[in-house]
């Protein structure tokens, strides 16, 4: 038995709020943290490997896993199915390692309602303002004005569900937000349910106490 059970760390935010950067920093801070590998029904792209970028499944295989309750969360996006297989996540957290999820609020709810939900830690990242959110999207130089407008419209749908999350951070300073994020993760790792070895330790203390009498 490991001293610690891993967490399911869920990071969500509207596009441009800094979630991806914070996720990279979190994984740099703790190289043992694993990023969740999703399953998908889309075809592999050149250079992609099964089990590394994605678990590539047929539609029948994917739907079968959903029916059997083997997906923590799943969604249909642009004609393909995507989801988080429960098996690899369960194995990872039982080995004492955390798993990081980049999902939206709907994925957060599904994970929270799964049998692993009691080990979930969900964090929502807010921008300091809508004006700053647009500025960040435009400064990337990656998207057309039309795509940016679509992302801005979707951002309110994401932001409006902030109340589903355990913690909400306003990312007005990236370094400060990173430190707050690490503080949250460090504290949540110490939750009683995340320390399976505690029960045996308490039994040992009880036995020692009884030997005194």
From Swiss-Prot:
Q: Where in or outside the cell is it found?
A: Cytoplasm
Which reactions is this enzyme annotated as catalysing?
A: GMP + ATP = GDP + ADP
The answer, when asked if rRNA processing is one of the entry's keywords, is: no
Residues the entry annotates as binding ATP: 13-20
Q: Which InterPro entries match?
A: GK/Ca_channel_bsu, Guanylate_kin-like_dom, Guanylate_kinase, Guanylate_kinase_CS, P-loop_NTPase
Domain annotation Guanylate kinase-like: ranges: 6-186
On the tree of life, the source organism's domain of life is Bacteria
Q: Does the keyword Lyase apply?
A: no
Q: List its EC numbers.
A: 2.7.4.8
**Class of the enzyme per the UniProt entry, highest EC level:** transferase
List, alphabetically, the CDD domains matched.
GMPK (cd00071)
Q: Which SMART domains does the record cross-reference, listed alphabetically?
A: GuKc
What GO molecular function terms would the record report?
ATP binding; guanylate kinase activity
Q: What is its main location?
A: cytoplasm
Q: Which UniProt keywords apply?
A: ATP-binding, Cytoplasm, Kinase, Nucleotide-binding, Transferase
A GO cellular component annotated for this chain's UniProt record is:
cytosol
Role this protein plays = Essential for recycling GMP and indirectly, cGMP.
By sequence similarity, the record places it as follows: Belongs to the guanylate kinase family.
Entry-linked NCBIfam families: guanyl_kin (TIGR03263)
Q: What is this protein called?
A: Guanylate kinase
Organism of derivation:
Ruegeria pomeroyi (strain ATCC 700808 / DSM 15171 / DSS-3)
